[in-house]
Amino acid sequence: MLEPRRLAARQIAERMAQILGEPVGKTIGYRVRFESKVSDETRIEVLTEGILTRMLVNDATLEGVSCLIFDEFHERSINSDLALALARQTQEIIRPDLKLIIMSATIDASIICQTLQAPLIESKGRMFPIETIYADHDIDRYQVAQEMAATICQAFRNQEGDILAFLPGQGEIMKCEELLRSVLPSATLYPLYGNLSPEKQRLAIAPSKPGERKIVLATPIAETSLTIEGVRIVVDSGLCRKLVYDARTGLSHLETVRISQDMATQRRGRAGRITSGVCYRLWTQTSEHLMPEQRLPEILDADLSSMVLDIAAFGENKPELLPWLTLPPKGNLVLAQQLLMSLNALTPDHDAHALSGSITAEGSRMAQLPCHPRIAKMMISSDSPASQALACDIAALLEEKDPMGENEDSDMTLRLSILRSARCKKNLGRWNRIAQIAQEYRKMLRIREDNEPIDAEEVGHLIALAYPERIAHATDHTGNFKMSNGNTIFIDPCDSMAANEWLAIASLNLASTSSSNSGQGRKGRVFLSAPVNWKNLPAQTCENISWDSKALAVKMQQETRIGALVIDSKPIQNASRETVSNIICEAARKDGLSMFDWNESVHRLQQRVAQVAEWHPELEIPDLSTEHLLTTARAWLPFYLEEGGKMKTSVTELKKLNLCEILWNILPYDLQQEIDRLAPTHIRVPSGSNIRIDYRLGAEAPVLSVRLQECFGMTSTPTVDAGRQPLLLELLSPGFKPVQLTQDLASFWQGTYFEVRKELKRRYPKHFWPCLLYTSPSPRDRQK
């Protein structure tokens, strides 16, 4: 029988054993992480979901198991979805006799029944009446503890019975507890959250003592499965912490979010288990309709690397082929596989976007450890028992909440030293849970406890094994660092770690933002780190040939790098022609307007060719527009980048390219001839001058700007396009000022010319302005 939480698994096993009048571990047993009570007589085992996954990976036949019960399945944790998918695979291929039962009080059963083709069994159960009291405003997320404390006080004074209050996290619980102690001295306060020891968790859910009124301040750990006797009042903040995976950064972080309606129903139900009760909701009845009906399956926005490793260990190389209830996002699956390949847990795949990769021997060892693959990599890669023992301590510290808090110095070695000192003195206190986890890991690795002094750089080296993309190098002396994945982080200069040149970052939050103008708001915040010697880290030597947008040239360097961090750089003299060409062409695609000399001659050629293409689409003339040329630079530019055995690599050299000649040569010879015939660049006028024709795509007609006097003797409007397109004549004065526009030169000579002649003769009296144009010589002829 699967339960989503350890506390619920223990309590349910204890309750069933109590009904049978037996101790836990006989007929009824349980197995949770690092703890089990089972025997050869055990018939019913209550497990957490990760334990079942491990059982399926180790033995897909599930020998000795006849039925699997998935309890509280509405929570849709990633482990429950994975366990169900693996169990269905086992049922379909190996164990058709294996029975699967899914149980929930609030889930939409019709969808699951349809997907699994399973019958539905419904039980109304027993629920006492519960009065629901809504707030007159939604809770202020920045005043959660204060508003919860006020409502708890109100409920304590106006109602009878014990109180179960739901808060989003441990921080709010501790603050609310502090507020309540001063105003409700007669109440007994019990916190209840995942990081508490099992003993303290049992105290919180135990029945009240005679004459005692209990207030339990809980996270969603108490939302399902648990029955706390005496509770008839629930105070619900309507908030919870959700672990959100950021695929961009590869980091997961907690966000405080609104709960869904089914979660609110589960919480409310805690008040009606024993007798009638009351539920206080710190939101309005109107806003309740805006809450989502069901929570999203965790598999849709979680880090999938542990899941993918388990699937590979199960023997399936293509996770998407499993019979999922909700298919995990392909993008997150690819990211998970890429991470596992970088940790050498999966064999590399040549296609970066393919969903495949077999488990390696190292990956199989990692999959046997009940922790994230990164942590497992660190523990199995340690090269000595002392180093492995240190890795176990680091793993335990990373898995539990930091006993020193996030606002303290980020020195990881300091925490490890405190842990070892407390272990030596047998006075662990708040470090006890961490010490227990480290001990369990040492048992798995079969090594002894080590409390010797710690080498800080060894700590950094181990962290770098788990988080190779979080190796960080100082970019200045004010706490700014750049990580090997390219992201930037900031450490307060007062932090002891800020003085190091190289760090390995164990815990950070790239979502940290600030309204400060210092620029620190764009960087991540570091919680745990250790110094590291970069000389002991694997580095790669590679050629970095790229476009330098500042120098406006191809940068050619041989670099020694750790990810995005450049340790050493030397110039390269001879890079391959193909590589340089590709880089320049890509730069041209992005910023080619500033890289070449797009002068007036180039623009005139483009307009002339485009004009003919518009007149004659049947000619299929290539597109010589600037936009198209830059997009297709790889097709034409490489032929002109080499001269005398040397590549042109800078904008200075590229601007010397004769674009007119290059663009003209893109056209086949027969098209060149046809364009020259249909759209000549110049036309000869009676004066003997060759006047340039101005082609403007989209204009009324090509324009011929010419002095009026040079047209004496021209009886009709000149044309292009084999006589089909008359030119628009822009007739100019001797001072090159426009005096007339016309496409009908013959009509102009017969009419308008005489009016224009009067004005020109007045302004330019020394010039020759004949009356009989057809017989009059041109100005040049007259001078002769």
Give the label of every model feature segment:
Residues 727-773:
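Long C-terminal appendages of very large multidomain proteins
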Residues 496-513, 697-722:
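Short, surface-exposed, low-complexity cationic segments
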Residues 774-783:
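Conserved small/polar residues in nucleotide/adenosyl-binding loops
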Residues 238, 258-261, 716, 723-727:
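Catalytic or ion-translocation cores adjacent to nucleophile or general acid/base/metal-coordination motifs
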